[in-house]
Amino acid sequence: MAAPDRDTITAIATPPGKGGVGIVRISGSNLGPVLDALLGRPPRPRYAEFRHFLDADGRAIDSGIALYFPAPRSFTGENVLELHGHGGPVVLDLLLRRTLQLGCRLARPGEFSERAYLNGKLDLAQAEAIADLIDSSTEESARSAQRSLQGEFSAHIHHLQECLVRLRTYVEAAIDFSDEDIDLLDDATLGHEITGLLDELDTIDTKAHQGALLREGLTTVIAGRPNVGKSSLLNALAGRDLAIVTEIPGTTRDLLRESLQVGGLPLHIVDTAGLRDSEDPIEREGIRRARDALANADCILLVCDARHTEAGDALPADLPETIPLIRIFNKIDLTGAPASLTVERETTVIHLSARTGEGVDLLRQEIIRRAGYKKGTEGVFSARRRHLDAIRRARAAVANARLYLHTKTAELLAEELRAAQKALGEITGEFTNEDLLNRIFSSFCLGK
């Protein structure tokens, strides 16, 4: 792990624009000259003191609260100064420029959190949870991010790593005593522990999957032929008029994106142009974009007109078969048929009316079910795709280890356990390369 920079960094920690309060944050190993020049004298550590923030001539740029946190008991583990002044962009810019005059460097996005990680104040999963908490779009996603920030996810990972260390110690002993008349791999306890570890990995995978859904949401693409009610369905799911609805085929020519909640699950809906052959170059471009959106969907809603049951597949033939598809027969208000949900050849079929709303709740429930989301699941923490990948690689390695235990191949068993431990270490940052760190922290906002 690289040592943190020793220079002093500064940034505005509040969002751009006007507000009642604006904050400038400073962190570094030597803040003495900055404290003297900006405040006249250092404030008492961990006390909120009203101060004037001074320019180079000793005149007040602004007045407000100064908070000083000496190292190591601070967010970054370094000396930290926060200046809470008025939230106008001009006064904040003047204050920021003053800190730069005093030798501070403008912080990179996420650099305060990066220093906290590098100084051991939090691990990588907790650092990522800060960004997830800021970006959360639902109450459930905010609560799951807070659990990760408090260390619940990391505690699960550390427990699994401790189990792996114990197993590795036992297996290494079996290798060391391989020339003796002792077969430690015959101990049934070892097999029980590996099986128990697999069960725990399955449990944490389930929770991490829920957390990833809350963080990232589900990209759901509405597709179908022109004039089957795709835009009406978007409006019905959103509960308000978002898309223009007319009887003229081809009204939607570009992608229309909307984010909303369905039972606490963030849903990113994409309404697309009707899929058909067209001579109109603008409509053709919209259809091309629709096909691109379909290829990247987490779930597809294929809308058909309930009056024309033969109006079947309008989907590109080259779509991945792994993308879940829900077939929707819309406009049952024109046929007199009731709303219903059935499963035909492993495909969910829903009859509904986007205009009246009849059957739309069936669709909402099916989207949640197909996503594998369980509202109100206790102990769910924020997770990312890289976390899921690491957990699943660890599980695969432990499953291989169980096979090698049965064949009593101790060296390969030990190697698989080591690989599992390394995969889990990537989550908390114990085994992480510099490129990954740069990608993670560069996605943070300035001042965090």
Curated annotation (Swiss-Prot):
Its main location: cytoplasm. (6S)-5-formyl-5,6,7,8-tetrahydrofolate binds at R25, E82, K121, K448. K(+) binds at N227, T246, I248, T251. Keywords: Cytoplasm, GTP-binding, Hydrolase, Magnesium, Metal-binding, Nucleotide-binding, Potassium, tRNA processing. It is an enzyme of class 3 (hydrolase). InterPro entries: G_TrmE, GTP-bd, GTP-bd_TrmE_N, GTPase_MnmE, MnmE_dom2, MnmE_helical, P-loop_NTPase, Small_GTP-bd. The keyword Magnesium applies. One of its GO terms (molecular function) is GTP binding. Its EC number is 3.6.-.-. Homodimer. Heterotetramer of two MnmE and two MnmG subunits. This is tRNA modification GTPase MnmE.
